Curated annotation (Swiss-Prot):
It holds the Pfam family Usp. It comes from the Bacteria. Was identified as a high-confidence drug target. PANTHER family: UNIVERSAL STRESS PROTEIN SLR1230, USPA DOMAIN-CONTAINING PROTEIN. This is Universal stress protein Rv2319c. Gene3D superfamilies: 3.40.50.12370. Belongs to the universal stress protein A family.
Length: 292
């Protein structure tokens, strides 16, 4: 068992490594830094190009390992770290090969640095992994920094659906395993076109508060039905849009937000709905996406 983090020199920065170290400490296991270099389609007549590509691939892998080692030297004290490099026609498939080969518990990804307003900008590789990974995927916001190397609290995103009750239970088991407190959080968000302008902001605010009140009742049922214990914090956060709502959630340094997903296909895989996707995009803390 190990934690796998995808890393390529100069691409996503050290945020993914910071998170990967914390996840490895949470699981009390080793860390594997995986560099996947895209392999082009074989062309027998271009032997010299193939040789140049192989050289470039080896140099990129070596540069990625050196860069990761520079960051991890001061971060990963007491953690066994190994480095894997392979060429693959698909970066996402290459990472999944490493995950399956090493029986990884979690796959850690970074966010593109140019996320504009969004804190997490998911590229095509991360998007495919979030929809196909057989293990939980942890993704970090761009330029994320944490001042503790431990997990301080696990928040569970609750969408008030029948499937999300099971997610709360799974998060409860994780919180117990990690030895940290748990919070169950849901969001009541005013959209841009919630109502036409003539309705007025007061009416919108009233409807939003009604939604929030209903969400509080649904959260309290989790406690009444024994899904969560008395020490679990239940919280509804409102906001004018997802960015404001996520900012208002009173995050702790060292906190992680866990989201559940729906099964997709014949086997358990991550399948993100719009609710989860918006939370991932604007979350100021790392997000742990659990397979369906």
């Amino acid at each position: 068992m190990t934690i796998v983090v995808g890393y390529l020199a100069g691409k996503v920065g050290p945020s993914a490594l910071h998170l990967a170290v914390r996840v490895a400490r949470m699981h009390k296991t080793s860390l594997t830094v995986a560099t996947i270099v895209r392999r082009h389609w074989p062309t027998p007549s271009l032997a010299r190009v193939d040789a140049e590509y192989e050289l470039w691939s080896e140099q990129l892998a070596a540069a990625s390992a050196r860069e990761a080692q520079r960051y991890l030297r001061r971060l990963a004290d007491g953690i066994e770290v190994s480095y894997h490099h392979r060429a693959h026609r698909s970066v996402s498939a290459g990472l999944l090969d490493v995950v399956e080969e090493l029986e990884a518990e979690v796959l850690v990804l970074g966010s593109f640095p140019s996320g504009r307003r969004a804190r997490v900008l998911i590229g095509s590789t991360a998007d495919r992994l979030l929809h196909s990974s057989p293990v939980p995927v942890a993704i970090t916001p761009r330029r994320y920094r944490c001042y503790t190397d431990r997990l301080t609290r696990l928040s569970c995103g609750y969408s008030a659906t029948s499937g999300s009750v099971d997610v709360v239970r799974r998060c409860g088991h994780l919180a117990s395993r990690y030895g940290v407190p748990m919070r169950v959080i849901t969001f009541a968000v005013r959209g841009r076109t919630m109502y036409p302008p003539e309705v007025g902001l007061h009416a919108e605010a009233s409807v939003l508060e009604a939604w929030a009140a209903q969400a509080r009742e649904l959260l309290e049922k989790l406690r009444i039905n024994g899904v969560v214990s008395e020490d679990v914090v239940l919280q509804v956060v409102t906001g004018n849009g997802w960015a404001q709502a996520l900012d208002a959630a009173d995050w702790q340094d060292g906190e992680i937000l866990a989201l559940g997903t729906s099964p997709f296909g014949d086997v358990a895989r991550v399948f993100l709905g719009s609710w989860s996707g918006k939370i991932i995009r604007y979350s100021p803390v790392p997000v742990l996406v659990l397979p369906g």
